């Protein structure tokens, strides 16, 4: 069944890991006939957590789509991971969602995940409501949870439901404030109306009056009616609430239990009645054919355009998940990829329900679906009609902040790892990797240790390669501290033409990181045509220092004398001679190891400042300054040796309960302390022995 854009809702579930987002999606599917049984994440049988890694770990790793059909509307529920390592999946979902539901637990109340979700919605000006989950579980406390939300997010959060407890403080139902009715959940999660308990009638009146006041503030007409003492009609209540949600002046709060189905149907009603359709949602920014910045709002009658917001690429094939921004999509359409300029022929179209792909003949404007086998299309691409090429804004993925070295357990499988990483990177753009020739390691950088562990597991399960993780080697440098003069003489007689090259070199500290090569030869002691060979020999030599084999920097090398043989001298002989001089002279020039220093910018709430500064001191860091960001956080700038930053992403997350973030960039090299030099030299020797 197809739906017009007015009857589509694209809603992402956000919140802390373990708060019940996947269970809520499962409840919505089950109660609307989308599934025949209610899945449970702990049993590994849910629609949204279908990946083997998700089933094994009992957490969401990827965003999954759960299309829910309810009261003539299609609700595309985007179930996102709550663990911070998989924040890229959340960013993808937010790019195409028209509203969000922030899920908070009645057992835990306010959480870091809810704070982060709220902030992400604020940055995008995304309409949202809050759902307090697990209200019927032991040790749950709805009132305490609501109070923490009100304290953190302000008086604009408005409860449209409230739980009903029995004498033993067990939740048995809920009050629907908007309709002034009460319900309990039946054995299959169905909604059964009950009388509003006498002790809840004052609560209902109080909540309804508060809701009326919030509605009155959405328009002058409703405000006048409110102050005249007139009651609002149901239509006016819906109109006001819908407007308040749209302009971000009102954030409804719903409660329930995904397991029992309590409150799920009311949540569906709220989604349909109050949350915006794609026509009313946040416009996407981008560029038109002339390169001008423009806003793009879904419009059914326009030429087709779609955003590729997610990619799934596994052993079963490749699906490019899209949101139709304008027009509609049909198989075999010819659309331009704005990134490459190439025209792409669309493959088969699908509506996804978890891993299940249902083929459709058309994707309507505003809808979310997938295109099969688009091998040259990547996440973030815009596909549009050649007559009106559109390029939507890139998806703002987080920068990698945690790096590890990946090594195959069986030698010779490096290419297999690289091929696997290429495929995995199609699905997850929050990590990258490089083959570091200097440290002889394949270094993968991403968001955290859990993400790296998942990558390792998928390399084994999907591509059959066993790998292990280790800390990346630090790219040290070497320099000298004093001037030396030394001879390098290469003489070899093998019958016939021999080999002869003789140079006198002066090595001294230089002014620039790159090698400074000079010549001061007088009288033709070394002919000029051999100067390039001497310089080439030096540039090859400085790649490996004499202390630990690291590149040499800040070196000035001057050729000032030497001798040659008219027959036996050659470019190769002089190149060899200067390298002999290098190996002889550099140990005499007081070589020292340099370590890379980076600029660290940490954003943290004020309350964690002491812990973070204490931790930086242990890392040999130097705090350079602090500035408030206007949101109750401090931005602290520091300089820290790169060698001390290996697990900083994990440690900062632990110190701040996930509230801290940071950026780190290399700025310069400086002398390493003696203990660091000694350790690095020993490690380099061990690495060389292993290579030999």
Segments from the language model and where they lie:
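Structural and coupling elements of P-loop NTPases
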Residues: 1-692
């Amino acid at each position: 069944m197809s739906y017009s854009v007015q009857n589509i809702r694209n809603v992402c579930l956000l919140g802390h890991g373990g708060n019940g987002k996947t269970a809520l999606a499962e409840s919505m599917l089950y109660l609307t006939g989308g599934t025949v049984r209610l899945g449970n994440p702990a049993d590994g049988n849910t629609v949204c957590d279908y990946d083997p890694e998700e089933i094994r770990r009992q957490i969401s790793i990827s965003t999954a789509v759960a299309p829910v059909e309810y009261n003539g509307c299609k609700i595309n529920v985007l179930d996102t991971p709550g663990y911070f390592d998989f924040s890229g999946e959340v960013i993808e979902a937010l790019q195409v969602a028209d509203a969000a539901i922030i899920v908070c637990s009645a057992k835990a109340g306010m959480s870091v995940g809810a704070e982060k979700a709220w902030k992400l919605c604020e940055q995008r000006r995304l309409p949202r409501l809050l759902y307090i989950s697990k209200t019927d579980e032991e040790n749950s406390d709805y009132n305490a949870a609501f109070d923490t939300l009100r304290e953190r997010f302000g008086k604009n959060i408005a409860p449209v439901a409230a739980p009903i407890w029995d004498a033993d403080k067990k939740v048995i139902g809920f009050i629907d404030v908007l309709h002034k009715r009460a319900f309990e959940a039946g054995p299959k999660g169905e909604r059964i109306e009950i009388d509003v308990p006498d002790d809840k009638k004052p609560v209902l009146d109080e909540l309804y009056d508060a809701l009326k006041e919030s509605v009155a503030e959405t328009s002058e007409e409703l405000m006048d009616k409110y102050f005249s003492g007139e009651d609002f009609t149901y239509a006016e209540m819906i109109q006001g609430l819908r407007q308040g949600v749209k302009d971000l002046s009102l954030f409804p709060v719903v409660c329930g239990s995904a397991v029992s189905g309590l409150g799920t149907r009311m949540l569906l009603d709220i989604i349909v009645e109050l949350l915006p359709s794609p026509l009313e949602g946040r416009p996407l920014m981008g560029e038109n054919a002339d390169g001008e910045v423009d806003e793009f709002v879904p419009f059914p009658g326009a030429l087709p355009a779609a955003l590729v917001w997610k990619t799934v690429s596994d052993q079963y094939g490749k699906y490019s998940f899209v949101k139709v921004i304008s027009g509609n999509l049909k198989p075999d359409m010819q659309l331009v990829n704005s990134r490459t300029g190439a025209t792409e022929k669309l493959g088969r179209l699908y509506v996804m329900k978890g891993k299940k792909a249902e083929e459709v003949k058309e994707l309507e404007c505003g809808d979310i679906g997938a295109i099969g086998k688009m091998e040259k299309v990547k996440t973030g691409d815009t596909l549009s009609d050649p007559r009106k090429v559109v390029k939507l804004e890139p998806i703002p993925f987080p920068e990698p902040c945690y790096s590890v070295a990946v090594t195959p357990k069986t030698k010779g499988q490096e290419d297999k790892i690289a091929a696997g990483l290429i495929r995995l990177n199609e699905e997850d753009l929050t990590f990258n990797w490089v083959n570091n020739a200097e440290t002889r390691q394949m270094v993968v950088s991403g968001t955290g240790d859990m993400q790296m562990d998942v990558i390792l597991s998928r390399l084994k399960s999907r591509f059959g390669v066993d790998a292990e993780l280790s800390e990346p080697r630090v790219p040290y440098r070497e320099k000298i501290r004093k001037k030396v003069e030394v001879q390098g003489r290469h003489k070899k007689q093998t019958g016939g033409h021999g080999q002869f090259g003789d140079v006198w070199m002066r090595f001294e500290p230089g002014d620039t990181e790159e090698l400074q090569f000079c010549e001061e030869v007088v009288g033709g002691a070394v002919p000029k045509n051999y100067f390039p060979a001497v310089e080439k020999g030096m540039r090859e030599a400085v790649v490996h220092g004499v202390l630990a084999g690291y590149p040499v920097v800040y070196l000035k090398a001057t050729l000032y004398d030497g001798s040659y043989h008219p027959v036996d001298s050659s470019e190769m002989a002089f190149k060899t001679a200067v390298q002999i001089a290098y190996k002889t002279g550099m140990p005499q020039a007081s070589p020292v190891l340099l370590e890379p220093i980076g600029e660290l910018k940490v954003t943290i709430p004020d309350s964690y400042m002491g812990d973070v500064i204490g931790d930086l001191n242990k890392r040999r860091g130097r705090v350079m300054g602090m500035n408030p960001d206007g949101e109750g956080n401090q931005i602290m700038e520091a300089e820290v040796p790169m060698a001390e930053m290996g697990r900083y992403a994990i440690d900062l997350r632990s110190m701040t309960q996930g509230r801290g973030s940071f950026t780190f960039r290399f700025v310069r090299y400086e002398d390493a302390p003696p203990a660091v030099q000694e350790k690095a030299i020993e490690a380099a020797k061990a690495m060389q022995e292993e290579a030999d």
